[in-house]
Amino acid sequence: MRKIVVGTIIVLAVGAAAIGWWFLQNQSASAPESKPTPSASKSEKPANPNEHNYMDTDFAKKMIVHNQQGIQMADIAKKNASGEEVRQLAVRMSDELTSDTKQYTDWLTEWKETYFNLSDFPEMEGHDMYPTHPGMASLSDLRELESATGSSVDKLFLRLMIAHHEGANEISNAEYLKGMQFGQMINLKNKTVKKQTEEIQTMKQLQAKGN
């Protein structure tokens, strides 16, 4: 009797082992073949620099309005500045900002993107619709510049335009704009930051000279 029991246990154990082996083999056969994980170091396909994305259009729209106010201030200084250095600087800035703005509007028009001009916003002090991008002058500042005379024009223009350039650079250096795609616009943005940084230093030197 004892031999029968022992024999039965052995048979059951062998059978269980066989069933287990069969189960594991079938699980391995039916499981989907694991695919190799792409290497983390493999870089993604670079974006096409001849195409544009949302960040490109958003930046262009901001700069159109921002630049148009800069042109407005520079044009006032062109006519009314008392110092020749300040007047010549205003002439150059007006030309540069006008050229850059035309380039941004041309791109947006080509891409069938709508945009606002500064003149589209109501000129009401404190109005919620008036642009308040970094560095932009208030309407009261603009009116003060328009009514200023003599050396007051130079002083106020330099103060407002330094802030205006610094604000433009702040916009251009925003973290999210690292995702810009359109190569020509990125180049223009970077060139403008460099140029306006130099102009800020020039304006500060003019201030130090008493302008």
Task: Spell out what each predicted region is.
Residues 7-23:
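Hydrophobic alpha-helical membrane-insertion segments, chiefly the h-region
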Residues 21-211:
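All-alpha RGS (Regulator of G-protein Signaling) helical domain and cognate RGS-like helical scaffolds
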Residues 1-4:
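Positively charged n-region of N-terminal signal peptides that target proteins for export
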